[in-house]
């Protein structure tokens, strides 16, 4: 053994060839600060070996290196800029020394090589991969950019266009694409990986392969003509501006850095990467996006723990076809759980099957599946008008009309047709689960399972625990939701549960702004362009459906009369009374026409101003700051109340539900992350300016207490140790 660290070791293989093996405790390898330091020590040992002829890098895990240790990021990002810069210089010196070894090097890459894992293998001369490879640089999705030389080496290896596509979008690619663009030199079966890598290494040692020529372009300026450079970087900057926008500075920073570094050799280019990385790491956007990643891991880990002793349902059923029922049926079947889809009429069943077939055909058109796979999936969706086969069902989700009497009757009837251990769930969006459970003989086998539309796109499923729902019931539906590729978050029962309960105060803030004379067009523009929502409130109401929102608003008002009951007619009432139901009938706040692709395109409609004038004060202008404050304060206050009342368990789960269920702008990280970034004391000062607007603007007592000491909701993060300590971590 030449060297042994906690996460990697170095040993001789044969005749002057050494192997460096990543083998961290646990199931995956991560390129954390300790591993970077250990890698530097191992390379130091290699540099002393006069008889070294070649080096093989490999992993003892199912994945090569999944990336940097993101749990370290928040503390690393708190160290002063100069100190973070020093540590990056140290880390890059390690990869430079790997790249500069006086012998050929090869990485045998299996599974994932992401972020720092990808940057590590970019420093070797050759890369051989297995078919399950996923390789790329996802850093821009975390609000940063590659910091271990990825923005320098990848463009010089692949050319500017391919590298920019991966780096700016935070993409990873599979084995075939990696081979096509030159990111790997070959792909072999897993059992042949080491044998194949050794064969390439021997050829390089023997002079049959010119490894020095392979290495040289990575050390030099990027080979691009002036015209090529102008085209590549201009197109990339245009694409980034269109897709990422001003709220996500990392992608455009990465593109500009690669452009600026193109004319330099490795050392100067790495210095530019360092100078760009460090300021990004100190942005609120990076902290928020890293926070989302960590919260996502926490939520998934919680679901995994909850379901460890539960068998995933093998047969499901959906009550109610149509768009929602068809979407749930498709998602279940697509992920391998057969589903019976029951409705009371043929037309609805046909609509449900058409929805599922449409989604499968999109997969076919994109080349994700072939005709055989399509036929196989669709054959596992069984449409029916009766309860045939329900005795085999493990879980049933009801997705019928949002009417408590109808839901109770259908659920009670279904309970008599299934096994005593079958779980029943309702896809209701607002009706309390404990109320629906009153109609059942086995309420312990019942819970809520709130999907979001469109089902195939929206990652969140709210799992609602009723007063009598058993732990096993909750675990079974969490297991099914996870199997469907969704992110299940368990909440306790109340009107609207979590997501809709906090959404309707936001809509109430919108209605009050309109009542006071604000223009809905400006509100939409401010909330989209300035705050960052994917849709402004008027547009969102049109998509949800004005009729749906009108009904849900009444349910919420009955559930929380002290805050959500109103004594005036608002914009939603006015549009509902005028039969303007939004996108579904082409008229809402906006007027909708189909574009060339058959998708609804919104246009202005002067008629809506006359309707709104009946329920509004004369038009007046509001500042962007006031619009954002008046829209967000009711939502944030309600989010805090849900945490204080135990409706949602943690700030992490609340923020993920908002991001995944409502499209809360990820660069803010969720309501609690936004609140922490703003500071609870500053938030209280802002909210108190608007408390005259009513109970929705009154800050909950728990938040007031935090504001007295400006306490955050997330646990405070300590800065990482000084850079000298990090080097030897």
Swiss-Prot record:
One GO MF annotation is: long-chain-3-hydroxyacyl-CoA dehydrogenase activity
Q: What Gene3D superfamilies does the record point to?
A: 1.10.1040.50, 2-enoyl-CoA Hydratase, Chain A, domain 1, NAD(P)-binding Rossmann-like Domain
Q: Which UniProt keywords apply?
A: Fatty acid metabolism, Isomerase, Lipid degradation, Lipid metabolism, Lyase, Multifunctional enzyme, NAD, Oxidoreductase
Q: Which GO terms describe its cellular component?
A: fatty acid beta-oxidation multienzyme complex
**Where on this chain does substrate bind?**
296, 500, 660
The pathway noted for it is:
Lipid metabolism; fatty acid beta-oxidation
Spell out the catalytic residues.
450
InterPro entries, per the entry:
3-OHacyl-CoA_DH_CS (IPR006180), 3-OHacyl-CoA_DH_NAD-bd (IPR006176), 3HC_DH_C (IPR006108), 6-PGluconate_DH-like_C_sf (IPR008927), ClpP/crotonase-like_dom_sf (IPR029045), Enoyl-CoA_hyd/isom_CS (IPR018376), Enoyl-CoA_hydra/iso (IPR001753), FA_oxidation_alpha_subunit (IPR050136)
Specify where the region named Enoyl-CoA hydratase/isomerase lies, as residue ranges: 1-189
Pfam families hit by this protein: 3HCDH, 3HCDH_N, ECH_1
The residues the record assigns to binding NAD(+) are 324, 343, 400-402, 407, 429, 453
GO terms of biological process kind: fatty acid beta-oxidation
Q: What is its EC number?
A: 4.2.1.17, 5.1.2.3, 5.3.3.8, 1.1.1.35
Give the positions of the site Important for catalytic activity. 119, 139
Domain of life, per UniProt, equals Bacteria
Chain intervals for the UniProt region annotation (Disordered): 708-729
Keyword field contains Oxidoreductase? yes
Under HAMAP family, the record lists: FadB
Job description of the protein: Involved in the aerobic and anaerobic degradation of long-chain fatty acids via beta-oxidation cycle. Catalyzes the formation of 3-oxoacyl-CoA from enoyl-CoA via L-3-hydroxyacyl-CoA. It can also use D-3-hydroxyacyl-CoA and cis-3-enoyl-CoA as substrate.
The UniProt similarity line reads: In the N-terminal section; belongs to the enoyl-CoA hydratase/isomerase family. In the C-terminal section; belongs to the 3-hydroxyacyl-CoA dehydrogenase family.
Q: In its UniProt entry, what is this protein called?
A: Fatty acid oxidation complex subunit alpha
Please give the organism. Answer: Escherichia coli O157:H7
The upper taxonomy is: Bacteria, Pseudomonadati, Pseudomonadota, Gammaproteobacteria, Enterobacterales
């Amino acid at each position: 053994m030449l060297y042994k660290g906690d996460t990697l070791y170095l040993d001789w293989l044969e005749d002057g060839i050494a192997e460096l093996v990543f083998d961290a405790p646990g199931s995956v390898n991560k390129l954390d600060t300790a591993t970077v330091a250990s890698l530097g020590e191992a390379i130091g040992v290699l540099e002393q070996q006069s008889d070294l002829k070649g080096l093989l890098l490999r992993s003892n895990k199912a994945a090569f290196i999944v990336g940097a240790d993101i749990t370290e990021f928040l503390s690393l990002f708190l160290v002063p800029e100069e100190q973070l810069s020093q540590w990056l210089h140290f880390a890059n010196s390690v990869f430079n020394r790997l790249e500069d070894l006086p012998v050929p090097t090869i990485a045998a890459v299996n599974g994932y090589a992401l972020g720092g894992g990808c940057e590590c293998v970019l420093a070797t001369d050759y890369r051989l991969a297995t078919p399950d490879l996923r390789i790329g640089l996802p850093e821009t999705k975390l609000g940063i950019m590659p910091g271990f030389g990825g923005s320098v080496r990848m463009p010089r290896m692949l050319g500017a266009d391919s590298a920019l596509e991966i780096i700016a979008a935070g993409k990873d690619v599979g084995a075939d694409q990696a081979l096509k663009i030159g990111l790997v030199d070959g792909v072999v079966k897993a059992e042949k990986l080491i044998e194949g890598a050794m064969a390439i290494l021997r050829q390089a040692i023997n002079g049959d392969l010119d490894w020095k020529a392979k290495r040289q372009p990575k050390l030099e300026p990027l080979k691009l003509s002036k015209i090529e450079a102008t085209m590549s970087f201009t197109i990339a900057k245009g694409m980034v501006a269109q897709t990422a926008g001003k709220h996500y500075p990392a992608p455009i920073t990465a593109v500009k850095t690669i452009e600026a570094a193109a004319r330099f050799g490795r050392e100067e280019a790495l210095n530019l990467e360092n100078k760009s990385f460090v300021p990004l790491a100190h942005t609120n956007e990076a902290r928020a996006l890293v926070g989302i990643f960590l919260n996502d891991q926490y939520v998934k880990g919680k679901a995994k723990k909850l379901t460890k002793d539960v068998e995933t349902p093998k047969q499901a059923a959906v009550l109610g076809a149509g768009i929602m029922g068809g979407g749930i049926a498709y998602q279940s079947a697509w992920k391998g759980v057969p589903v019976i889809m029951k409705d009371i009429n043929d037309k609805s069943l046909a609509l449900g099957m058409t929805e599922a077939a449409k989604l499968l055909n999109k997969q076919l058109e994109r080349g994700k599946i072939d005709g055989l796979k399509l036929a196989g999936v669709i054959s596992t969706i069984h449409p029916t008008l009766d309860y045939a086969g329900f005795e085999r069902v493990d879980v049933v989700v009801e997705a019928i009309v949002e009417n408590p009497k109808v839901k109770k009757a259908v659920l009670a009837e279904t309970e008599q047709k299934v096994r005593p251990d079958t779980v029943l769930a309702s896809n209701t969006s607002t009706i309390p689960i404990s109320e629906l459970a009153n109609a059942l003989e086995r309420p312990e086998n019942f819970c809520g399972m709130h999907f979001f539309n469109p089902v195939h796109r929206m990652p969140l499923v709210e799992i609602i625990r009723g007063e009598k729902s058993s732990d096993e019931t909750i675990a079974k539906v969490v297991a099914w939701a996870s199997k469907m590729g969704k992110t299940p978050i368990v909440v306790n029962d109340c009107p609207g549960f979590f997501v809709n309960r906090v959404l309707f105060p936001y809509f109430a803030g919108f209605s009050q702004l309109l009542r006071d004379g604000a223009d809905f067009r400006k509100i939409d523009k401010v909330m989209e362009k300035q705050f960052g929502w994917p849709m402004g409130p008027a547009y969102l109401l049109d998509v949800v459906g004005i009729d749906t929102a009108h009904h849900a608003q009444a349910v919420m008002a009955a559930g929380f009369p002290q805050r959500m009951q109103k004594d005036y007619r608002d914009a939603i009432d006015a549009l509902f009374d005028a039969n303007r139901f939004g996108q579904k009938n082409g008229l809402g706040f906006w007027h909708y026409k189909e574009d060339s692709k058959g998708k609804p395109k919104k246009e202005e409609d002067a008629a809506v101003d006359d309707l709104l004038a009946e329920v509004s004060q004369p038009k007046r202008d509001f500042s962007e700051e006031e619009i954002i404050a008046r829209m967000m304060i009711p939502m944030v206050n309600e989010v805090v109340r849900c945490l204080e009342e135990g409706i949602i368990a943690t700030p992490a789960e609340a923020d993920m539900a908002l991001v995944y269920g409502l499209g809360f702008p990820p660069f803010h990280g969720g309501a609690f992350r936004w609140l922490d970034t703003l500071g609870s004391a500053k938030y209280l000062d802002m909210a108190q300016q608007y408390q005259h607007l009513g109970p929705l603007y009154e800050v909950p007592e728990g938040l007031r207490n935090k504001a007295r000491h400006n306490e955050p909701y997330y646990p405070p993060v300590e800065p990482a140790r000084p850079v000298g300590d990090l080097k030897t971590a």
